């Protein structure tokens, strides 16, 4: 998915709060260093103007250890309205918001790569 989006000039946006945000920043930096267009945007920044960056076909990866983050729950709806591909990384398999995402990576004990 990432390679396909990259070859079509699309961007991967990564978002998460707290420690998940730290992981997201690191991941965006690592992907950029190997030539994949990636950028970290904090969840609250999306609702304060950053949604304008998104183009149809872009991907947003949402990272949350618990999956119980109200800001991320609101964002998923905004991304879906704009036809944005969503990927979730979560440590909690039972979170209902994961069902709304296009792809999910679940890691029980530890989320961090």
Ranges and model annotations:
Residues 11-17, 21-113:
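Glycine-rich phosphate-binding loops that contact phosphosugars or nucleotide phosphates
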């Amino acid at each position: 998915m990432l390679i396909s989006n990259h070859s079509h000039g699309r961007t991967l946006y990564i978002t998460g709060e707290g420690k998940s945000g730290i992981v997201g920043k690191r991941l965006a930096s690592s992907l950029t260093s190997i030539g994949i267009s990636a950028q970290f945007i904090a969840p609250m920044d999306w609702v304060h103007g950053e949604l304008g960056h998104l183009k149809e076909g872009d991907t947003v990866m949402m990272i949350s250890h618990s999956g119980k983050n109200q800001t991320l729950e609101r964002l998923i709806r905004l991304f879906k309205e704009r036809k944005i591909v969503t990927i979730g990384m979560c440590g909690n398999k039972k979170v209902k918001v994961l069902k709304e995402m296009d792809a999910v990576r679940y890691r029980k004990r530890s989320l961090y790569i």
